[in-house]
């Protein structure tokens, strides 16, 4: 067996749901094998262009475009960009000679993993959602190993190569101290905290629904609302909202470990990483799936956690009719919240990143190029 350091090619892009799991896996690989040579492939105009270099890894640009379901005219250039991306990926794989290629989804993963497979490199895929995305569903047929976050995803990939290992999450989420977290949000020991968030950009539906029921929530004398509005909605909401000693409105929460540690209950979207963060932190939640995602995968995520007893699922269309009642009932029922928290932790896979990293290194050792 060769003694040279393993060479690993990572690819996953477009959104945080694809980018951050790739970074977490790379970090875990580096923790296990500090000598590992890890490089990323991705686009130059999406999240990975900023997040990957900030995490300390080199990013090799690949031209890529997904199928546009709304802006149909832009699909005219799709064949040319796919071909360009394949040529770039072929050259990249030839230059770095990876022992294994790891994909976490997003359309940029398609040309890179296809080029790696055509050059005889083993593929490992990580799927974050209960319903596997298009790129991963196609490439899973070529992969030697498929790591899943939800057991339901086994229905969409070759079962003989699949293992349920969870989504990689940040260690800082699990290290946060609840007392320090509550102090950071000025919440007393006996306060009940509702955490509201709709992603980094925000959710118009969740923000609007919370704004309409804010008065009855704060009428509960010990309820504190920590509200991440998202960048799109912060200015307008803060202009409309009156100040209140138990209301904390922020554009974005950098220390999410503190937010989860302080929360008694969350209301949020049902993206894959959010669901995984809820489970590893044991945070009961009301999940409001976004209707604007491919294959309605957030609803499938929400259903999975609701079936496990870890969350309550509400459609966007039902927020005005039911959100106030659901939130007040849960905030008033500590026993049910405790059961939901326990069910969430039962679904958690806190060692997901390390589990996947060990598999990456095992494949690299088995298929070392020289």
Curated annotation (Swiss-Prot):
Entries under Pfam families matching the protein: Glyco_tran_28_C, Glyco_transf_28
GO biological process, one term: carbohydrate metabolic process
Principal EC category: transferase
Location(s) in or outside the cell: Cell inner membrane
A GO term for molecular function: UDP-N-acetyl-D-glucosamine:N-acetylmuramoyl-L-alanyl-D-glutamyl-meso-2,6-diaminopimelyl-D-alanyl-D-alanine-diphosphoundecaprenol 4-beta-N-acetylglucosaminlytransferase activity
Matching InterPro entries: GlcNAc_MurG, Glyco_trans_28_C, GlycoTrans_28_N
Gene3D superfamilies: Glycogen Phosphorylase B
UniProt entry tagged with the keyword Cell wall biogenesis/degradation: yes
Gene Ontology annotations for the cellular component aspect, listed alphabetically: plasma membrane
Pathway as given in its UniProt record: Cell wall biogenesis; peptidoglycan biosynthesis
Binding sites annotated in the UniProt record for UDP-N-acetyl-alpha-D-glucosamine: 15-17, 129, 170, 200, 253, 298
Protein name according to UniProt: UDP-N-acetylglucosamine--N-acetylmuramyl-(pentapeptide) pyrophosphoryl-undecaprenol N-acetylglucosamine transferase
UniProt xrefs under PANTHER family: GLYCOSYLTRANSFERASE, UDP-N-ACETYLGLUCOSAMINE--N-ACETYLMURAMYL-(PENTAPEPTIDE) PYROPHOSPHORYL-UNDECAPRENOL N-ACETYLGLUCOSAMINE TRANSFERASE 1
Organism, scientific name: Salinibacter ruber (strain DSM 13855 / M31)
Record function comment: Cell wall formation. Catalyzes the transfer of a GlcNAc subunit on undecaprenyl-pyrophosphoryl-MurNAc-pentapeptide (lipid intermediate I) to form undecaprenyl-pyrophosphoryl-MurNAc-(pentapeptide)GlcNAc (lipid intermediate II).
Membrane topology type: Peripheral membrane protein
Record keywords: Cell cycle, Cell division, Cell inner membrane, Cell membrane, Cell shape, Cell wall biogenesis/degradation, Glycosyltransferase, Membrane, Peptidoglycan synthesis, Transferase
EC number: 2.4.1.227
Catalysed reaction, written as an equation: di-trans,octa-cis-undecaprenyl diphospho-N-acetyl-alpha-D-muramoyl-L-alanyl-D-glutamyl-meso-2,6-diaminopimeloyl-D-alanyl-D-alanine + UDP-N-acetyl-alpha-D-glucosamine = di-trans,octa-cis-undecaprenyl diphospho-[N-acetyl-alpha-D-glucosaminyl-(1->4)]-N-acetyl-alpha-D-muramoyl-L-alanyl-D-glutamyl-meso-2,6-diaminopimeloyl-D-alanyl-D-alanine + UDP + H(+)
Protein family: Belongs to the glycosyltransferase 28 family. MurG subfamily.
